[in-house]
Amino acid sequence: MEPVGDPQTAYRAYGPALVRKAERILRSREDAVDVVHALFVDLIPRWSRDVDLPYLYRAVTNRCLNFVRDESNRARLLEREAAAVAPRARVR
């Protein structure tokens, strides 16, 4: 596969397609945009001229799966906290 060039060029050229990919997984445009932006922000300091499109698609997919997992864990923790704080019914 051909390298995608520098981060700015790659983002302009492939950002919309990467957001669509993320949106299909997350079912939220806002979250998809956040995931793609975060990916590029994290990649910029260690960008390599060898970065290609399949790498970016795989990275976005992995970020989305991590996002879903983290949201699931967060929801579970909130449920536990709510159960611990909720007043218990008194039995007479």
What are these regions (language model features)?
Residues M1-R20, E30-V33, I44, S48-L53:
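A short, charge-rich alpha-helical start-of-domain segment used by transcription regulators
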Residues E2, A13, A83-R92:
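Amphipathic alpha-helical segment used for protein-protein interaction
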Residues R12, V19-E23, R27, F40-S48, ...:
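Short amphipathic alpha-helical interface segments enriched in basic and hydrophobic/aromatic residues
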Residues E30, E81-A82:
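Solvent-exposed, flexible loop/coil residues
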Residues V51-L53, R58-R80, P87-A89:
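Arg/Lys-rich amphipathic alpha helix in sigma70-family domain 2
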